[in-house]
Amino acid sequence: MKKHKMLSLLAVSGLMGIGILAGCSNDSSSSSKGTINIVSREEGSGTRGAFIELFGIESKNKKGEKVDHTSDAATVTNSTSVMLTTVSKDPSAIGYSSLGSLNSSVKVLKIDGKNATVKDIKSGSYKISRPFNIVTKEGKEKEATKDFIDYILSKDGQAVVEKNGYIPLDNAKAYQAKVSSGKVVIAGSSSVTPVMEKIKEAYHKVNAKVDVEIQQSDSSTGITSAIDGSADIGMASRELDKTESSKGVKATVIATDGIAVVVNKKNKVNDLSTKQVKDIFTGKTTSWSDLSK
């Protein structure tokens, strides 16, 4: 098993407060000349799974098993917010994030000359994107769960998706409430959580007596929660694998999201190729100055 530095939100807050985050530098020139500080998501993160697949950082061994080649030098963060905070505080850092979760604290890079925007994802020119899925136990959904899902997939729910910077589904239908009470527990991906929170807020305006509880973790935990019944709906920012699908759950796409490669705002780099990103995250390229060679 690979060993990485692991950062949680609490750890980041403490380290940033005293300015000793491992590998960080306050010299802005280091962002384009010094060592590249890789920041990755944790194993189990759907964003990490999609990122390593789309950039070729993952391969299969002779047994057909997937192998993640993310560099051992990477600092691992346990949520989208920690990823963005870590990169924003380290001039030498590079990481990745859900497009819909981005904020102004980091700089978004072009990939192969294309912008990480909804427009370019829709046109197909920016290819680093993945589905947002909800995961449910087939045939076991409670009436309140079905109603909330109907809202997510409706015109109203998809309008929330689009308003928050994600790509909505086509041909959504009008929502009609079918229940007036109940509770829905939702668990999983920290990338899906922000838009799910917004959907929950909008849903409560039309069906206030249904209690919706959202528990943030990661995609794998969300899928497991749907499988074992501890959650009514799992959130996953990746597709189900064969093992998961065989356990009686199904995935339903609720939106499409891009994955943006991000650096510190002091960094002078604006554009990387797919190969350059792969070489950085696998540890082949370790210095910012190597990118200009």
UniProtKB/Swiss-Prot annotation:
One of its GO terms (biological process) is phosphate ion transport. A lipid is attached at residue 24 (N-palmitoyl cysteine). It is a lipid-anchor. GO terms for cellular component: plasma membrane. The keyword Lyase does not apply. A lipid is attached at residue 24 (S-diacylglycerol cysteine). Residues 1-23 form the signal peptide. Pfam families: PBP_like_2. It is found in: Cell membrane. Keywords: Cell membrane, Lipoprotein, Membrane, Palmitate, Phosphate transport, Signal, Transport. Gene3D superfamilies: Periplasmic binding protein-like II (3.40.190.10). Its main location: membrane. The keyword Membrane applies. Belongs to the PstS family. The complex is composed of two ATP-binding proteins (PstB), two transmembrane proteins (PstC and PstA) and a solute-binding protein (PstS). Part of the ABC transporter complex PstSACB involved in phosphate import. This is Phosphate-binding protein PstS 2. It comes from Streptococcus agalactiae serotype V (strain ATCC BAA-611 / 2603 V/R). The lineage of its organism: Bacteria, Bacillati, Bacillota, Bacilli, Lactobacillales. The gene is pstS2.
